[in-house]
UniProtKB/Swiss-Prot annotation:
This is UPF0761 membrane protein Spea_3909. It comes from Shewanella pealeana (strain ATCC 700345 / ANG-SQ1). The keyword Transmembrane applies. The chain crosses the membrane at residues 5-25, 45-65, 102-122, 141-161, 179-199, 213-233, 247-267. Signal peptide: none annotated. The keyword Cell membrane applies. Residues 309-322 have a biased composition (Polar residues). Residues 295-308, 323-340 have a biased composition (Basic and acidic residues). GO terms for cellular component: plasma membrane. Keywords: Cell inner membrane, Cell membrane, Membrane, Transmembrane, Transmembrane helix.
Length: 340
């Protein structure tokens, strides 16, 4: 009996996952995730150099981050660009060096382009959440500016804190020394989860529950790690881009990876936004089913009462007939007595 209950529970759980998957597919088609990802990839490539230039300029403004730029570059290019990271790093560093030599007007233009990317991300995510409200221009600008300026500082501070904690004697001279390499290997995954979680909770205008955002962030981070390994394997084992484009193969490789990355980000957003809708639909289905069952039981009760009253009524009528016959027999008996 217990085994049957466990099997039914597992079956219902798998069916609910399948139903949620179908719900996500309908949302993907309705929101046109592939088109949104292509738009964001295009804007990202246009604003990649400005954002990197702003990041490094913000880090250089704080002396504590003076020796962390190379570590930050290596961390970003090694963990977020699965293939051709060295070539992309060389090109981007050259572009950033050229951009930093520009005039004040050019620097302002770079800032505007970087803000355009953040604005595009904001609009894409809020469209997934079906948000009709809009933020005020001052609020949007302040939020975009905070992300653009404080984001690099927070990333640099986290890397500095991580390197400091790892260098402590507590981790090097105790049994925890074997845990340190495992934690360092898991750092990209942890950073991805934290970044996705912050993105899914802060950017949407609607209120997002923490558990829903955490589920979307975990799925997006796992897909991101799998995507990095799969894309790196494809590029290294099937070098079709290098055979076709030659020295320019880095450009389409970078564009395809940025597109895949944005698809993963939007998939996590769809999961986070679609989960409360699916749970609400399931709740409505249960409530309607319960109401229908209660209505059926109410309609069946009078029918059963009438059925139960049938034999009693027949017995009562039979008794009445007997009583009537007895009453009719009484005058006949009186007449017979008089004749006697």
């Amino acid at each position: 009996m217990k085994n049957k209950i466990a099997i039914n529970q597992v079956r219902s759980f798998l069916l609910s996952i399948w139903a949620f998957f179908l719900h996500l597919l309908s949302r993907f088609k309705e929101d046109q995730v592939n088109i949104k990802a292509g738009h964001l990839a295009y804007v990202t490539l246009l604003s990649l150099v400005p954002i990197v230039a702003v990041m490094f300029s913000m880090l250089s403004a704080f002396p504590v981050f003076s020796g962390i730029r190379e570590k930050l570059e290596g961390f970003v290019y090694d963990n977020f660009l699965p293939a051709a990271g060295d070539t992309v790093q060389i090109y981007i560093n050259e572009f950033v060096a050229n951009a930093s030599k520009g005039t004040s007007v050019g620097i302002v233009a770079l800032m505007v382009v970087a803000l355009m990317l953040i604005s595009a991300i904001d609009k894409a995510l809020n469209s997934i959440w079906r948000t009709k409200e809009k933020r005020q221009a001052a609020v949007s600008f302040s939020m975009y500016w905070m992300v653009l300026t404080l984001g690099p500082v927070l990333v640099g501070a986290s890397l500095v804190a991580t390197s400091y904690i790892v260098s402590l004697k507590l981790f090097s001279e105790t049994e925890l020394s074997g845990v340190v390499p495992i934690l360092i290997e898991r750092l990209p995954m942890l950073f991805s989860v934290a970044a996705f979680l912050l993105l899914y909770m802060v950017v949407p205008i609607k209120k997002v529950k923490f558990l829903h955002a955490l589920l979307g962030a975990l799925v997006a981070a796992m897909l991101f790690e799998l995507g990095k390994k799969g894309f790196a394997f494809y590029v290294t084992q099937f070098p079709s881009y290098e055979a076709i484009y030659g020295a320019l193969a880095t450009i389409p490789i970078l564009f395809v990876w940025v597109y895949v990355s944005w698809v993963i980000v939007l998939v996590g957003a769809e999961i986070t936004a679609g989960l409360p809708e699916y749970l609400h639909e399931c709740k409505l289905i249960r409530e309607t089913a319960l109401a229908e069952s209660q209505a059926e039981t109410k309609t069946e009760e009078p029918v059963t009462e009438s059925k139960n009253d049938g034999p009693n009524s027949s017995n009562d009528s039979g008794q009445d007939n007997v009583r009537g016959s007895e009453k009719t027999d009484e005058p006949a008996q009186d007449k017979q007595d008089k004749l006697d």
